[in-house]
From Swiss-Prot:
Protein name as it appears in the record: Arginine--tRNA ligase
Superkingdom, natural source: Bacteria
EC numbers for this chain: 6.1.1.19
Underlying gene: argS
Source species taxonomy: Bacteria, Pseudomonadati, Chlamydiota, Chlamydiia, Chlamydiales
KW Ligase (keyword) present: yes
Length: 562
């Protein structure tokens, strides 16, 4: 139970006891924004004033009378009727012991679900670019957190490995005798050439469409080339996933191809199809455009595939929740998709599906992050540059480091910096990509969080301790100790709000706050050789474990030295 949920339960019982005419209530409890106002604040007295026809302060006084003061150093009424709660140091000491146990086992939910998270999803025969970065990083982070709290998570890579583009590419490869391609770079060049020819040569276009049919019909030659194209692409994708430490299971669009005719047939049986301009569409009230599920030439599109995927994930994967992580530009598509899936019965209710949309990555001028020639920046090149920038940062700020030490640390710092900069931005917002900012040692950066963790490793080395014990106990005396204890106990709340909103920046904000509290504690409270060394090392152990856990959930790696 979090401190927030504990207070919510106390206030609910107090309100219902003080005012029996109120049948039910979900108390409005928030973390206090200033230490002056205690640890937490109840805001319900003002909200109940109109219903109860009483002054808010009188309501607050009635509520406070119903609450036991055992675990609090103070419960005060402030302003118009805010109830400010400050926990006692004894209660915080005991709560830290419970927190230590929960931290080791994970904050397990009582009713674990099957959660399918669809993220990354690059296209075959094309380089992954900076646009895939956010989907990959955000999706991985959410998957890690859902797993941490006990859910059964299926991470799916909905790779674009089917459609007209493959007929075009296969035809070009056959006719240009380029079947000995070895790299994704080769494929990308050939894809661009094929695309130009497809647009300019009507006969080539017809042959490409014939090859699409051949591929869909299982023609051995077309199939063999398609498999080769996929294998080369996936090998390049996996290289990036290895660098970013991403675990994901491939299930491309082609997987759902056998189910597409059945989807159309089922939608027609349920009278959901309307023929519009010779195409089969599903119209929904409140939307200006329909969801087209079959083109006028009888071909299927990605909406048909997405419907088949939605149905399969519910019926075969037994998903209780389906989360798809793509850019905000696809919001309307997924709104129409959800409406259609609900109407068709592929989704049991509105609580199953969530589209996790995200904003753009921008350059220093606020424009979409691209090369000077206007092309998307290749993700592999971006990651390589991040490592180079991390090397430069270490050489500047850590001149005493050997080349070997820098080479070992730079990949970790580079990937941490990129991930944290992305995840610390509200996912629906655009953000400006800046290596200079993301590799800073101060501010809300991965380097700053890691420095807090490394500082604890330094304490251990100086004391000759290999591992700090989580079996001890706290003895809070100083204000900085109290602030640090409270910060630690708020980690489960950060996890809760991150999962509720599906926004990782709540977790990064928490880690930044915790690291600041730890640095203040380190500044104010002498540890090594202090009469309180044991108790303060216990707080260090909890911070170390919390930072390591939080960084892991973000997909970041730790280092013992920086």
């Amino acid at each position: 139970m979090t401190l927030l949920s504990y207070l919510s339960s106390l206030c609910r019982e107090a309100i219902l006891s003080a005012f029996p005419q109120i049948e039910t209530i979900s108390p409005d409890i928030t973390q206090s924004t200033k230490e002056l106002f205690g640890h937490y604040q109840c805001n319900d007295a003002m909200k109940l004033a109109r219903t109860l026809k009483m002054p808010p302060r009188a309501i607050a006084e009635s509520i406070v009378k119903q609450i036991s003061k055992n675990n609090f150093s103070s419960i005060e009424i402030a302003g118009a009727g805010f109830i400010n709660f400050t926990f006692s140091k004894e209660f915080l000491n005991l709560s830290l012991q419970s927190y230590s146990r929960d931290l080791s086992s994970g904050f397990r939910v009582q009713d674990p679900k099957k959660v399918v998270i669809d993220f990354s999803s690059p296209n075959i025969a094309k380089d992954m670019h900076v646009g895939h970065l956010r989907s990959t990083i955000i999706g991985d982070c959410l998957a890690r957190i859902f797993t941490f709290v006990g859910h059964d998570v299926l991470r799916l890579n909905h790779i674009g490995d089917w459609g007209t583009a493959f007929g075009m590419l296969i035809t070009y490869l056959q006719e240009e005798s380029s079947e000995d391609i070895e790299s994704l770079e080769d494929l990308t060049i050939l894809y661009k050439k094929a695309h130009v020819r497809f647009a300019e040569d009507a006969e080539f276009k017809k042959r490409s469409q014939t090859n699409v049919v051949a591929l869909q019909s299982g023609d051995p030659k077309a199939r063999k080339l398609w498999e080769r194209i996929c294998e080369i692409s996936e090998r390049a994708f996996q290289k990036i996933y290895n660098i970013l430490d991403i675990q994901i299971e491939k299930r491309g669009e082609s997987f759902y191809n056998p189910f597409l005719p059945e989807i159309i047939e089922d939608l027609e049986k349920k009278n959901l199809i309307t023929v519009s301009d010779e195409a089969k569409c599903v119209f929904h009230e409140g939307f200006s455009i329909p969801l087209m599920v079959q083109k006028r030439d009888g071909g299927y599109n990605y909406a048909t595939t997405d419907l088949a995927a939605m149905r399969y994930r519910v019926e075969q994967d037994h998903a209780d929740r389906i989360i798809i992580v793509t850019d905000m530009g696809q919001s309307l598509h997924f709104q129409l998709l959800e409406a259609t899936a609900l109407a068709a019965g592929y989704l049991p209710n509105k609580d199953v599906f969530s589209h996790v949309g995200f904003g753009l990555v921008l350059d220093s001028e606020g424009k979409k992050f691209k090369t000077r020639s206007g092309e998307n920046i290749k993700l592999q090149e971006l990651l390589d540059t991040a490592i180079d920038q991390a090397v430069a940062t270490l050489k500047k700020h850590r001149p005493e480091m050997s080349d070997a030490e820098i080479t070992e640390r730079a990949p970790v710092l580079g990937m941490n910096a990129i991930k944290y900069a992305d995840l610390s931005s509200h996912r629906v917002s655009d953000y400006v990509f800046s290596f200079e900012k993301m590799l800073r040692f101060e501010g809300n950066t991965a380097m700053f969080i890691l420095y807090g963790y490394v500082r604890i490793q330094g304490i251990k080395r100086r004391l000759g301790i290999e591992k700090l014990s989580l079996e001890s106990a706290a003895n809070i005396q100083e204000p900085s100790e109290e602030a640090l204890a409270l910060a630690l106990l708020r980690f489960p709340e950060a996890i809760d709000i991150t999962l509720k909103e599906l926004c990782p920046h709540f977790l990064t904000d928490y880690l930044y706050m915790l690291t600041n509290k730890f640095h203040a504690f380190f500044r104010d409270c002498h540890i090594e050789g202090s009469p309180h060394q044991k108790e303060r090392l216990y707080l260090c152990a909890l911070v170390e474990k919390t930072l390591a856990t939080g960084m892991h959930l973000l997909g970041l790696q730790t280092l013992d030295r920086l």
